A protein has these predicted regions:
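Trp/Phe/Arg-rich N-terminal binding region typifying the photolyase-homology
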Residues: 2-150
Length: 150
């Protein structure tokens, strides 16, 4: 029997709005293309600290959703790691300490999210790691629709 090798040794998959195991484009890619996948969620200071966009109800819903996701992952023999820091700092630390060679995410389209992903991509490039992002939450890529601008 022929042994198949995968493209990546260790991938980091970062959950964001996609708090599910089923029908998750980026997660499926990571599982199919990496020998090992680290699953994490990163609370950024902007989500937690008081600001005009923060909602206690939204934060509570996110925490409850993460608890449900963690139970699903544990039931499948995995682990969900939770972090609190600027995402690019966590990514850099995990790349160095865990020898991650790919960071995988599903795209998000808010101005904040686009800037966040640009910083993560720059961190990955600086450290020689692949950054893979996928359209997942929408039927059509957000900026492919006429009249939709960045």
């Amino acid at each position: 029997m022929m042994k198949t090798s995968k493209k990546f040794q260790k991938a980091l998959f970062i959950f964001r709005r996609d708090l599910r195991l089923e029908d998750n484009t980026g997660l499926v890619f990571a599982l199919e293309h990496a020998q090992e996948v680290i699953l994490c969620f990163i609370f950024s200071p902007e989500q937690i600290e008081h600001n005009p966009y923060r909602s206690d109800h939204c934060l509570q819903f996110m925490i409850e959703s993460l608890e449900d996701l963690e139970k699903e992952i544990i039931a499948k023999g995995g682990r969900l790691y939770l972090f609190y820091e600027k995402p690019e700092k966590i990514v850099a630390e995990l790349i160095k300490k865990q020898h991650v060679d790919a960071v995988v995410v599903n795209r998000d389209y808010t101005p904040y999210s686009i800037k966040r992903d640009q910083k993560i991509d720059a961190t990955c490039k600086k450290l020689g790691v692949s950054f893979c992002s996928f359209d997942d939450a929408l039927l059509h890529f957000a900026f492919s629709i006429p009249g939709c601008r960045r």
